[in-house]
Every structure is written in C-alpha cells, then in structure tokens.
Amino acid sequence: MEKNKYIYGASIQGIQGFIFSTNSLKDIVGGSELVEKICTTLFESNYLQGGTSIINAAGNIKCVYDDLQECEKTVLEFPKTVMLAAPGITISQAVVKVTEEELKTHFASCMDLLEKKLKIQRNKPARSMTVGFMGVERSRTTGLPAITQESQEYLDEGTLKKRELSIGGKATIALAEKSFGLKDLSPKNIALDIKRLTENNDWIAIIHADGNGLGQILSKFSSSMEKLKDFSEKLNQATCQAARAAFKKVYTAEDYTQDSSIFPFRPVVLGGDDMTMICKASLALDYVKVYLEEFENATRQKLGAENGLTACAGIAFIKSSYPFHYGYDLAETLCTQAKIVSKNPLIQKDAKNAPSSVMFYKVQAAS
C-alpha cells in the first residue's frame, strides 16, 4: 500500500499592521524580530519534527509531513502558538493529502491546490483575540486592552511582547546582522529611538522593495520539492546579499565605529524577494539604487543568468512624527505603481523582465 504524504501550508497575515501599530521605533524593532522568529525558529523548533521544510520566509511556511499525527498537531497548535507569541497576528492554514507518487510526478499541481486552499482560508475572517471587554483600561497608542503599566504608559499584550524582544538580547540584532552582513553587533548599534536614527534631521524614509516576475520564474522551479526548496533558499540568499551590499556601499561613506555608532538603518522585513527598511532620509535613494543593482546581480549569480530577476521599490519620505503605518502603506503603493509603469510595453520593450525601478514621494503635510 502506497504511503500518503501531507503538504502543509501556512500564511501569516497582518504582519505589517502588527509591526507598524505604533510610532515607537523600539516597538517596531520588537515587532519585526517577533515576525522573523515566528517564521523561522518558532516553527522549526516546535513543529518541523517529522517534516521536510520547503519554504520558510516572509510569512509563508510550507512543508511536507510523512505522519498524519504530526500534521494534525501542527494544524491544531501552531495558530495558538503564533497568537500567543505575537497577539494581533492571524494565520491561515491548509493541507493537501497526496501519495508519494503524486508528490514526485505532480508536485506543481499539488502546490497549486495548496495555494487555492490557502486563498480560501485567507478570505475567512478570523476572530480577534485582542478586542477585550468594555470598561477595561486600554493602551493609548494601540487602543487595545492593557495588561500592565510601565511608568505612566499602559501596554497591551502585543506591545509588551515587542518590548521584551527589542530591549537587550541577541534576538534584538538578529535581523540587523542578516541585513548588514556584520557579525557581533552590539545593541548600542541599533536605534531604539527615532531621534537617534535621524540625528539632527527629522526626515526619515520607509523603503519597500519587491521582486518582479517571480511567478513566471517560479513555474520553472515548481516541478519538484527539491527544486522549489533550492529556489526559495537561493532567492532568500540573493535578497540578503543585495541588502548587505547596499548597506556596506552606502554606509562606508560615513565614518563610524562598530563599537559605538548607531546605524542610520533599521531593517523591518528581509526574506523571500521582500525588503522593508527604515532609514535616514538622505541615504534612502543611494541605498535603493545599489540594492536594485545588486539584487539583479545576485539572482543571476545564484539562479542562473537566464533566471535573473529585477525588482521595484517605493520610498516614502516622512517626518518622524508621521504615522509609520501610513508611511509603509505609501511605500508599498509606490512600489506597486513602479511595477505597473515598468511593465508598460513602451518601457519594457522586448526585455524578458520589467526593468528595475523606484518611485518615491515626500509627504509635506504635517502629521
């Protein structure tokens, strides 16, 4: 009798809303670290026993289980684990049951079915775990029920989790080390106050970059689990390589000592083909220019010249007091518009991929 396999998929939702729910940089730092932890160590250490990982980045988790009980355990327990670790984030899950032969010969079709099931689940509203009762004290920044008080500030559970992770410890700088390509960073290098990031200039930039034509390239690598896993890992490596190259090329122009300097960059998301960064406004355009160039070079190097990718970016220049979630929404919208313009036949012409491009906007209105 042929043994069955179980393809498990999870899509974590509300990531950006969770990260940018306040204008406190230390809370954004903690939020980004929490999301990074959920997608990597939290899942791997608790739910990957007996499973084989396929994709594990940027809020998407896919793996194959040999044992039904292990798969059922993940479906039952992982959402609760996520919601306890990061209150405010929701998760959609789906499972496709296949035979070993189907997994080998029709892997792409199996993954398409999994994506369809995940899409259905994402459209089902999730019950909020953070609404609370009337008459309870609430956080002044998020409006959610407070569970503790620090000095004169009431903190909800999500903010408390972010603070615990953002202040001290190796987790605070894990994403920064991955983004900068520097080892043994000190917490002193990471700004937890927006004023330390901007120095005397109150302008900051929120950058969001995303790869072009990923769906077309992905179809080439979806014929087997091994190929898709290898593609996912190499794409993630290329994105990190581009971010590191951009940081080192742009920031070497500024004098700093790793022991004491606060870097004018704060990575928020880095994985898959996505990159979100908060930085000093004067460095944003130079950083994005190098990042887009290096992303093209790195994907050609790792995926092959014929499979190289391009990317588009959006930059929102805002005052540090301007609501971060509006700034991120603007950066994401600008990135989307840059993609639309790049795909114009008059611009793309006969090129296989839309050219890399950037669109930016400076918000002049008061916060």
Label each region the model flagged.
Residues M1-S367:
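Regulatory and interdomain segments flanking nucleotide-handling catalytic cores
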